[in-house]
Amino acid sequence: RRQRQMCIRDSSYGTNRENDLPDMIRSLKGRIHFAHVRNLKFNSDRDFEEAAHLSADGSFDMYEIMKALYDIGFEGPIRPDHGRMIWGEVAMPGYGLYDRALGAAYLNGLWEAIDKSSAK
């Protein structure tokens, strides 16, 4: 049954700095059907911008977000949510191909590392 399933979008829930994203993910075990994952960088409490996916480039611990998804046995699709325009790309704002591709590779790398370290 897919009633009351949801898409977790960390960049939406993460705009409230009081939200513990990994904890929220764990509390929604079995209800998350799709995950949009990206990083944000806070400039102040209410001012933020989308950042590259790497944890060091923003305010979210991307490893902990992906680990929370892994820990709950998430098997749905995970995609990078939005992308910056980089390397001179001209595209629809927010949907830069290169940054989304880098994000997808990074998220896959995190997942593989978590999976391999959990198998020990």
Language-model region placement:
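Gly/Pro-rich active-site loop or hairpin
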Residues: 13-75, 89-101
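Generic beta-strand/beta-sheet core signal
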Residues: 9, 37-38, 81
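A structural motif corresponding to the C-terminal end of an alpha-helix
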Residues: 1-2, 65-75, 107-118
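Glycan-recognition surfaces
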Residues: 9, 33-34, 108
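Short acidic/histidine-rich active-site segments
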Residues: 77-84
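C-terminal helical cap(s) of enzyme catalytic domains, especially alpha/beta-barrels
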Residues: 91-119
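Short, small-residue-biased leader/transition segments that mark boundaries at the very start
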Residues: 3-8
